[in-house]
Amino acid sequence: IIGAGGMGRTMYDMARESIGYGTQYDIHGFIDDNVAALDNFANYPPIIAPIQGYQPQEDEVFVCSIGGTSRQKCMEEIIGRGGKFLTMIHATARLGTNVQVGEGTIVGAFTSIGADAKVGKYNLIQSYTVVGHDSVIGNWNRIDTHVTLVGGTIVQDGTDIHTSAMISHNVTVESHSRV
């Protein structure tokens, strides 16, 4: 897990509750430039190394808990060193017929993605979010909790859609927007 802050600790719990845990992947630990990030916390796997300079092993897959503008940069560093990102879908998420979810995308607990929606690569879609039918989500987006994207919504690339936003039918959210 990249990042051992609050979202990283949340990602640890989510990873243990997601499809494939224990059969397709296990949690080895965190990488974080703040190697003391877990000093005041118990019951988490260790921070095994800083992010800077970390060399991914062939059998490792990653999820990234870092938000904001540094998320993409951090992930691209790991990808550039040969790292691969896990597509992680929480066991309680509901995916409709013909839904496509790209590599490295995280789908949180109790999230619903409607029929024929397409979700690109490296997105973070947090818990209790609704992505309506026929919606298209590009790459590198962060969609926070309790967001509703009604049917036919298009979210281009690199956007941040914050908690409880509601976006109506057939609206396009342009690249690098903040909602």
Specify the residue positions occupied by each region the protein language model found:
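Glycine-rich adenosine-cofactor-binding loop
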Residues: 1-15
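Active-site catalytic pocket residues across diverse enzymes, especially alpha/beta-hydrolases
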Residues: 15-19, 78
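NAD(P)-binding Rossmann-fold cofactor-contacting core
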Residues: 18-39
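Structural signal for interior beta-strand "rungs" in well-ordered beta-sheet cores
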Residues: 87-179
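Phosphate-bearing ligand-interacting subdomains
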Residues: 35-94
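Short hydrophobic segments within beta-strands
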Residues: 1-2, 31, 65
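Conserved acidic residues
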Residues: 28, 60-61, 103
